[in-house]
């Protein structure tokens, strides 16, 4: 129970409070971009990760609600949902588990931090000004 609450506090409540405090300036400026980092686990679920999946699914709900609330003020809110990304954490995983996970990805590889960052940068740009309330799964096709 404590682990569940800690994961929700970090991944959902943390985003809520960040949005709450940054929105004041966005509203004042009549412009803003909010990009939440969710996960394909929040879209698909994953055995053994009920706490994380719940928090990330909740973040998607928060994203969509905030997008509706703030759209009239020229503030967009979207979420990026990374799939399997090459990080120090994934590098520490046993090779067999890593290979099994990558085998589920239609593109046949893990994503990179740069690919996630480029997606976030796009959503922050003027080119994404007509995109709000969306979840962009950057997952090599895993969630399709």
Regions found by a protein language model. Give the residues of each.
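Substrate-binding pocket helix/loop in short-chain dehydrogenase/reductase
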Residues: 3-8, 90, 101
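Active-site loop immediately N-terminal to the catalytic Tyr-X3-Lys motif
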Residues: 44-50, 72-73, 108, 126
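C-terminal helical subdomain
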Residues: 79, 102-127, 131, 138-140
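Alpha-helical segment proximal to the catalytic Tyr-Lys
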Residues: 24, 68-72, 129
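Active-site helix of classical SDR
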Residues: 19, 55, 63
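A short helix-coil junction within the Rossmann-fold of NAD(P)-dependent oxidoreductases
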Residues: 21-33, 73
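Residue(s) in the substrate-gating loop at a strand-loop-helix junction
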Residues: 39
């Amino acid at each position: 129970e404590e682990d569940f609450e800690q994961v929700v506090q970090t991944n959902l409540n943390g985003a809520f409070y960040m949005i709450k405090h940054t929105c004041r300036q966005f509203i004042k400026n009549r412009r803003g971009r909010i990009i939440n980092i969710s996960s394909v686990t929040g879209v698909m679920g994953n055995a053994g990760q009920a706490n994380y999946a719940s928090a990330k699914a909740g973040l998607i709900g928060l994203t969509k609600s905030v997008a509706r609330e703030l759209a009239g003020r020229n503030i967009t809110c979207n979420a990026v949902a990374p799939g399997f990304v090459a990080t120090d954490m994934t590098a520490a995983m046993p090779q067999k588990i890593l290979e099994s996970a990558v085998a589920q990805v239609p593109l046949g590889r893990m994503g990179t931090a740069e690919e996630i960052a480029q997606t976030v940068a796009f959503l922050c740009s003027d080119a994404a000004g007509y995109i709000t309330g969306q979840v962009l799964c950057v997952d090599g096709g895993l969630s399709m």
